[in-house]
């Protein structure tokens, strides 16, 4: 309720008015005009406008920035955002020379959002002499406003006619922005224009200058570079590429060879021999055969399985496979152009089971076979299977020319098993390897699970249209059989198309995130511009990546950065918008530049922490040896940092522009306007939308501010045990069993589509099930041992460009021709053949160790022929150098001519340069190790062979000491690089996260807890991926290393909030961090989760894996940060300076300066000047200390409760003290006490209390620093006659706290007193600024307050005061009753009965105005006696913590004015205590751990009002959120 000047009329929040007659106040204005001093133009004070309800130049009092849910007000307010009709003409001045306290009369809280914005050159003044007209600016909140300059009764009874208002727009000379925030506030369009220009230039340069990326080869870059094996493999490949005719190296001595023969310029020495040979189809046009050729790897093929899980060896299934072949492949219009032909009109038949059964049973086609043919063929296969299995039945047992069995081969094989080679081809190509095993010999019908179909078309790009037209959208089944695997040779080509087509899923994710962001911010403009900033981040980072960093390779994985950036960018936008709205709520009348400065100071730090940790996790991938991973890490990390830069330049300018011009562009989000009831569908829809949003807002507020803290704290031990168990289980899965498996597919079979795709199933499953694939892909092939001399194993290419492999670097010390080298290398070959890992081949080996072959050739030459000398047997080994150099050339040419064995670039032996000088030597042997994809076996092979060769080379002569060994180790090197690189990247990410956390909080304990939480997140996430069947491949390595960057964000936010919490105890800090950051973190997790979920339908594996990972890591990270980390802090969290790193004050981050700056020794009286710096300077000059703390307030002190011990920094004007209207009252404590001391004798109780306050050494409730001690801070505060101005108040209070930033009381509110609340329309005032911003979803603003109004009469009418010590957890409220002798109303006044305690701790108590005092604390009870003067001492309950002290008036003299409390609509769960204490019992309480959680009473007639229990006698100090 509010007070009317001249009478004690009380307006309750439910609309009723309670009045009581009183003596008129001596300060009541006679005409309702503003008294002002008449000053000269040069004497006009040019002070900074007070942002929180200060007196303005035109006599108005800035109304607060408040959305209210005043649904009980019966009338509709007048329209907001118009020129104020109650302004006086510009020329009207008052002759009064004093600044009376009635200078500004507050507007109704329901009308408090009509923001009057002065130009910057007009400054606020306490006693202005002019009234410059303010422009009626747009409304900032969804509640209309009035601009009132008359006393309330006169105004509402006699509303004047709208006067003509002259709008004066003073010229604004150009002034260079004082700061970056001023630049954003004054020139947002310029900032946006510059950013747009930069983005456009980067886009044009990035697209036009370098070549566009090519994704045709998705496997490009998936190879290690820079490792020992990698360098050797690159050098070996360079050797093969540079070996040939007229190349750097050659197998033949060409100068010598040209003298012998000039026919060696064959294609076998061409440059393209270094590429991987690909077997081409050797078309065989034999018309006398049913089939045109033998099926081979070069043909397109399809794998069938039974649709019902039965065997395929039955007549319907066999015919079904033929039907699918005819309907899906052979019927395609392009098939006739692609197929192999025997005649001009017909294509060759496909190799299917049906056609083989037909040829064996003399049927014309597959459709003609019968059941008997199937049985006969099965019997034949059973008879011949053993010959195939023991190797006697081969592919050449049938003589096609003679059309009979080859008489010279397969002598032990029955003739029927060799007919047409059908049995061999069926068992080798068409059926799986388990069909005719000895285990199935006794089965009546062996189970044929899979069957292959070969089509007479070459696989490759030509099959693309057939697949897209007939297979892509087909359900792959005809009811009998199902196509489970396809190999058309178009996997990588199709991947490039799918990579572009599946970008629709990231687009859907972006759209949904946009929708969430739009609902959250209620601004389509901010949403679209945020998304534009995210897309621009990718564009600018692409420019930096390609042009500035000069990266030539752009892997396809870089496209997935968009998905990660959408989630991070949305999170940053939420943080910035939240802090902006916190600032606007806390400083509703702050200049735009100041609001931007405060917002950036806190939001920029928060966004930087999250962006830097995630970017660091990406950049940590640069330590990997795999090219694609390194490039992706650089690009993604750069994109996140660029996004951060745009979020602190682009987005603030967007918000300023939106706040200034575009606030009402969308009608549904527009503030309610007073208009006739609109029954249109759009109006009804908007109204319902607002109601739904409000309901969701309230539900989320209740959950995050009440339910979630209650759940976390009450079950904290259960949560700790549960999440520790999960961590241990995840660590066991990751490290012990089953462990994260390394890749099981070769690089050529690298998975690019989802696992269910038929292309991927063929590579992953069916290649292992058919014998021709097992033999072709190296199963059971021996690993080669290749030893090389003469070339240095150096990779001189660009490791960031997979196409740059460098050039050969020859070893200048190499010398094989010396006798010592000849003898050593021969001995080396002999020793190697004696090793256990050497495999002896049956065939004669001419090339393995060339020195052995050369020595044997020399010994076989007859020296009788003069032409052979000296290359003959007369020479003994080792040979002279000149003999060796000459004879080696003859031996090579003779070997080529006599044996017909042609040497190629892979053949071991000597390598010659263009001068026929031996520059390199290659030896190659077969090992007993078989090729496998198992990492352990390959590691054993490499370690064993490499260690033996290294040991032997240590004794080699100088010319052979630099040899090295290589083999087919590409896949093993990839596995090794992935396993090591992933662990290193994760460790580096954790180290960076710990460093950032430490630098952010300056607390070791919190940082360690955060790292423990991150470790648990990593173990559980990776363990879950292991159980999902993930293998540690390239994509998986990237995603897992990024898990650190994505999971650290939540712990950092909670940790910072824990440090910022003003509560001294752990529980209060945990509740503060949960209520402050809970909803913001949940929204961040939700947006990232949604972005990941939208990836799941994608065909591209990179999208689906990233989506799976993002969903999993968001859920696990949120759970660990919310329950595990917070429970750790609740049980073992630091208190006070525990774990705090001492750091110089000047170098601290500003959010912690208030907690780090004060020391116990800084509380002396010599520091009191710092406290007075917060008072209003008549010259408008604020100290630097005030300015620094002013910007700390929105994050550090959004609420002020009895347990927070936090003050607010913004001073108030005298008029706000004396007129009884508090809009944003912030009163310097020393000033208040100084005023009290000047008027009260030292013998009065108030003075005694004051002296005791200065003597005691306990916590000061007015200090931001919880270590600052000043007990009994709330004492007898009284404001005297209007002549006492703010600057006249002393600064003698609480000298022990004066040095800190917290020497002031702020009676803060975003609400003006109810002047015309009965005019507010029910249902039109929307309470929710956002849908879910933390702490602002409630039906009141965060800094809601109740103020008291008192009419001062005389200084000597002072009531006695006493000190009450109230419990921090169970706050009390007092009920003030006037004496019965009072000639005015004897009605008891009502006091708010709820103390929010950070919106968490609530208890309703009814108290008597009589105070009880005791040494240990006091406890009040309701008393029905109106004239109680005696003080009783009550003992506080043992479980209660005594931290807050309040000074309450014991009695009010009947000559003194009465107190009235303006009960405004407030938070659910709080209501005014009526006269009877029994009424408070309607408010239910439930015990939540150690907290008292209050349940709202929905049946309250008077809206609930949150107040603070710290109440002073004649000047009620009420602190709330």
Curated annotation (Swiss-Prot):
Main location: membrane
Protein name (database record): Protein dispatched homolog 1
Gene Ontology biological process: determination of left/right symmetry; diaphragm development; dorsal/ventral pattern formation; embryonic pattern specification; patched ligand maturation; peptide transport
UniProt cross-references to InterPro entries, sorted A to Z: Dispatched_Hh_regulator, HMGCR/SNAP/NPC1-like_SSD, MMPL_dom, SSD
Organism: Mus musculus
Native organism taxonomy: Eukaryota, Metazoa, Chordata, Craniata, Vertebrata
SSD domain location: 485-657
Quaternary state and interactors: Interacts with SHH; via the cholesterol anchor of the dually lipid-modified SHH (ShhNp).
Residues listed as glycosylation sites in the UniProt record: 14, 58, 390, 581, 1455
Compartment list: Membrane
């Amino acid at each position: 309720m509010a007070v009317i000047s001249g009478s004690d009329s009380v307006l309750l929040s439910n609309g009723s008015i309670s009045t009581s007659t009183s003596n008129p106040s001596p300060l009541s204005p006679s005409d309702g005009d503003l008294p002002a001093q008449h000053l000269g133009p040069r004497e006009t004070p040019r002070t900074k406008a007070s942002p929180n309800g200060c007196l303005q130049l035109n006599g108005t009092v800035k109304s607060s920035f408040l959305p209210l849910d005043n649904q009980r007000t019966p009338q509709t307010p007048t329209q907001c955002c118009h020129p104020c009709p109650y302004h006086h003409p510009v020329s009207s001045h008052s002759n009064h020379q004093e600044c009376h306290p009635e200078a500004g009369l507050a507007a109704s809280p329901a009308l408090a959002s009509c923001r009057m914005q002065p130009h910057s050159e007009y400054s606020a003044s306490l006693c202005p002499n002019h009234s410059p007209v303010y422009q009626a600016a747009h409304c900032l909140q969804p509640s209309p406003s009035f601009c009132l300059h008359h006393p309330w009764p006169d105004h509402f009874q006699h509303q004047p006619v709208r006067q003509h208002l002259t709008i004066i727009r003073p010229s604004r000379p150009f002034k260079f922005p004082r700061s970056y925030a001023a630049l954003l506030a004054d020139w947002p369009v310029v900032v946006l224009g510059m950013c747009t220009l930069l983005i456009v230039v980067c886009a044009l340069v990035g697209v036009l200058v370098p070549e566009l990326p090519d994704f045709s080869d998705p496997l490009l870059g998936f190879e290690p570079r820079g490792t020992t094996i990698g360098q050797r493999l690159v050098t070996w490949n360079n050797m093969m590429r540079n070996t040939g005719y007229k190349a750097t190296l050659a197998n033949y001595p060409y100068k010598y060879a040209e003298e012998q023969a000039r026919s060696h310029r064959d294609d076998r020495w061409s440059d393209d021999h270094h590429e991987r040979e690909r077997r081409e189809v050797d078309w065989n046009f034999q018309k006398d055969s049913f089939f045109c050729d033998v099926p081979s790897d070069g043909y397109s093929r399809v794998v069938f399985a039974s649709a019902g899980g039965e065997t395929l060896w039955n007549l319907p299934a066999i015919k079904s496979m033929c039907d699918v072949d005819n309907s899906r492949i052979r019927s395609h219009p392009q098939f006739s152009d692609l197929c192999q032909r025997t005649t001009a009109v017909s294509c060759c038949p496909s190799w299917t089971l049906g056609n083989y059964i037909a040829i064996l049973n003399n049927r014309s086609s597959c459709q003609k076979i019968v059941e008997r043919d199937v049985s006969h063929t099965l019997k034949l296969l059973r008879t011949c299977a053993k010959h195939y299995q023991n190797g006697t039945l081969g592919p050449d047992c049938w003589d096609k020319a003679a059309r009979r069995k080859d008489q010279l081969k397969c002598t032990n094989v029955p003739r029927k098993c060799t007919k047409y080679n059908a049995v061999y081809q069926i068992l080798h190509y068409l059926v799986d390897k388990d069909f005719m095993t000895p285990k199935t010999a006794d089965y009546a019908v062996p189970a044929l699970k899979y069957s292959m179909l070969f089509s007479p078309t070459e696989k490759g790009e030509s099959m693309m249209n057939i697949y897209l037209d007939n297979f892509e959208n087909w359900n792959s089944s005809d009811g009998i059989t199902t196509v489970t695997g396809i190999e058309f040779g178009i996997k990588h080509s199709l991947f490039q198309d799918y990579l572009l087509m599946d970008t629709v899923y990231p687009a859907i994710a972006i759209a949904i995130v946009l929708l969430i962001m739009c609902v959250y911010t209620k601004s389509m403009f901010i949403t679209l511009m945020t998304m534009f900033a995210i897309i621009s981040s990718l564009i600018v980072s692409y420019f930096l990546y390609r042009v500035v960093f000069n990266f030539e390779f752009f892997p396809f994985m870089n496209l997935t950065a968009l998905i990660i950036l959408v989630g991070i960018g949305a999170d940053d936008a939420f943080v910035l918008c939240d802090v902006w709205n916190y600032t606007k709520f806390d400083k509703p009348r702050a200049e735009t530049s100041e609001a931007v400065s405060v917002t950036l100071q806190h939001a920029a730090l928060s966004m930087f922490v999250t962006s830097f940790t995630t970017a660091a996790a990406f950049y940590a991938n640069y330590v990997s040896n795999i090219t694609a991973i390194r490039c992706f890490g650089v690009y993604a990390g750069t994109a996140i940092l660029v996004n951060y830069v745009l979020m602190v330049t682009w987005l603030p300018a967007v918000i300023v522009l939106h706040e200034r011009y575009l606030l009402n562009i969308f009608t549904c989000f527009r503030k309610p306007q007073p208009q006739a009831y609109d029954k249109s569908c759009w109006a009804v829809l908007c109204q319902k939308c607002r109601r739904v949003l409000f309901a969701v807002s309230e539900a989320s507020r209740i959950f995050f501010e009440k339910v979630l803290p209650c759940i976390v704290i009450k079950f904290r031990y259960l949560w700790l045990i549960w999440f520790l168990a999960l961590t241990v289980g995840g660590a066991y899965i990751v490290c012990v069993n089953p462990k994260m498996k390394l890749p099981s597919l070769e690089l050529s079979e690298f998975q690019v589509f989802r696992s269910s795709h038929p292309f991927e199933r063929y590579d992953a499953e069916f290649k292992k099930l058919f014998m021709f694939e097992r033999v072709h892909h190296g199963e059971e092939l021996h690993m080669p041992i290749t030893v090389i001399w003469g070339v240095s194993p150096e990779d001189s290419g660009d490791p960031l460009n997979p196409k740059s492999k460098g050039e050969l670097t020859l070893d200048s010390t190499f010398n094989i021709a010396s006798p010592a080298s000849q003898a050593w290398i021969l001995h080396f070959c002999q020793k190697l053949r004696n090793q256990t890992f050497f495999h002896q081949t049956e065939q004669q080996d001419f090339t393995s160790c060339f020195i052995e072959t050369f020595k044997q050739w020399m010994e076989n030459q007859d020296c009788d022929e003069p032409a052979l000398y000296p290359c003959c047997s007369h020479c003994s080994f080792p040979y002279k150098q000149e003999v060796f150099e000459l004879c080696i050339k003859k031996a090579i040419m003779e070997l080529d001519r006599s044996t017909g064995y042609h040497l190629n670039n892979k053949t071991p032996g000597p390598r010659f340069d263009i001068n026929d000088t031996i520059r390199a030597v290659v030896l190659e042997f077969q090992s007993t190790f078989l090729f496998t994809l198992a990492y352990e076996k390959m590691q054993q092979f490499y370690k064993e062979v490499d260690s033996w060769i290294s040991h032997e080379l240590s004794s080699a002569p100088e010319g052979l000491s630099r040899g090295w060994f290589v083999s087919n180790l590409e896949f093993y090197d990839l596995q090794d690089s992935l396993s090591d690189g992933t662990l290193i990247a994760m460790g580096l990410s954790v180290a960076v996260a710990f460093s950032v956390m430490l630098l952010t909080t300056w607390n070791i304990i919190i940082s360690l807890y955060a790292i423990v939480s991150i470790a648990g997140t990593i173990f559980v996430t990776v363990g879950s991926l292991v159980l999902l069947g993930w293998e540690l491949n390239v994509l998986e390595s990237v995603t897992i290393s990024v898990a650190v960057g994505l999971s650290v964000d939540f712990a950092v936010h909670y940790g910072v909030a824990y440090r910022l919490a003003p509560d001294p105890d752990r529980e209060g800090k945990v509740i503060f961090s949960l209520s402050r950051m809970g909803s913001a973190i949940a929204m961040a997790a939700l947006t990232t989760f949604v972005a990941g979920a939208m990836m799941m339908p994608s065909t591209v594996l990179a999208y689906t894996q990233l989506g799976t990972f993002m969903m999993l890591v968001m859920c696990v990270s949120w759970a660990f940060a919310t329950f595990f980390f917070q429970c750790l802090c609740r049980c073992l969290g630091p208190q006070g300076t525990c774990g705090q790193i001492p750091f110089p004050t000047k170098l601290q981050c500003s959010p912690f300066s208030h907690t780090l700056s004060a020391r116990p020794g800084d509380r002396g009286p010599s520091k009191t000047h710092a406290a007075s710096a917060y008072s209003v300077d008549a010259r408008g000059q604020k100290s630097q200390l005030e300015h620094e703390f002013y910007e700390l307030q929105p994050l550090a002190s959004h609420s002020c409760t009895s347990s927070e011990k936090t003050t607010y920094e913004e001073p108030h004007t005298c008029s706000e003290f004396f007129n009884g209207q508090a809009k944003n009252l912030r009163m310097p404590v020393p000033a208040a006490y100084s005023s009290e001391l000047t008027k009260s004798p030292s013998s009065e109780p108030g003075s005694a209390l004051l002296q005791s306050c200065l003597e005691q050494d306990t916590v000061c409730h007015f200090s931001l620093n919880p270590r600052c001690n000043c007990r009994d801070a709330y004492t007898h505060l009284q404001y005297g006659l209007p002549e006492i101005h703010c600057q006249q108040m002393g600064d003698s209070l609480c000298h022990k706290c004066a040095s800190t930033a917290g020497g002031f009381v702020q009676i803060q509110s975003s609400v003006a007193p109810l002047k015309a609340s009965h005019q507010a329309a029910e249902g039109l005032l929307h309470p929710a600024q956002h849908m879910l911003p933390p702490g602002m979803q409630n039906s009141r603003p965060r800094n809601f307050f109740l103020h008291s109004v008192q009419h001062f009469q005389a200084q000597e009418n002072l009531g006695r005061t006493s000190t009450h010590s109230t419990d921090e957890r169970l706050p009390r409220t007092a009920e003030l009753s006037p004496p019965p002798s009072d000639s005015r109303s004897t009605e008891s006044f009502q006091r708010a009965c709820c103390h929010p305690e950070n919106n968490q701790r609530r208890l309703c108590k009814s108290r008597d105005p009589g105070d009880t005092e005791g040494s240990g604390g006091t406890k009040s009870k309701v008393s029905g006696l109106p004239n109680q003067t005696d003080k009783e001492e009550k003992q506080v309950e043992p479980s209660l913590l005594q931290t807050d002290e309040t000074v309450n008036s014991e009695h009010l003299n009947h000559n003194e004015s009465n107190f009235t409390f303006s009960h405004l609509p407030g938070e659910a769960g709080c209501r005014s205590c009526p006269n009877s204490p029994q009424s408070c019992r309607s408010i239910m309480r439930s015990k939540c751990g150690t907290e008292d959680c209050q349940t709202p009473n929905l049946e309250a007639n008077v809206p609930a009002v949150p107040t603070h229990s710290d109440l002073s006698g004649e000047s009620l100090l009420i602190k709330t959120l």
